[in-house]
Amino acid sequence: NVVGTAYVHYHNGRINGEMAEKIVSLARETCKNDVHIILIRGRAAVSFEAAQVFARADLTLIGCEFQSIATADAVVPVHRILLDHGVLILEGLRLDFVDPGEYFLCAAPLKLGNTEGAPCRAFLIDFEVKHWR
């Protein structure tokens, strides 16, 4: 299970190393340095250089709306560097009604044996919300 402060960032297109550094910096600034989860809303894909930045950023998890977090030219290397650095990957999120900012994430995967991935029930809590939809 993954629970903790999460930063949601909106981005469309390829995320290069420079953009990844900006995202990490914004996450730390917004969440007062207490963030180990970054979720990317939009049609974004992480390049190998960006994956290196995220891998060094002491993240627990990175998530995206696409079915793969990686750019088409670096699917295996992006997944490998993140996983080798202990960064879990959460793909296929529905963030279309989530504004950028700070949230609390709870992601509870199904316990399956001998698999490289598992479906999970993930939800965000916005402690600043004034009303519930």
Q: Over which residues does each language-model region extend?
A:
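Active-/binding-site microenvironments in catalytic and ligand-binding cores
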Residues: 1-133
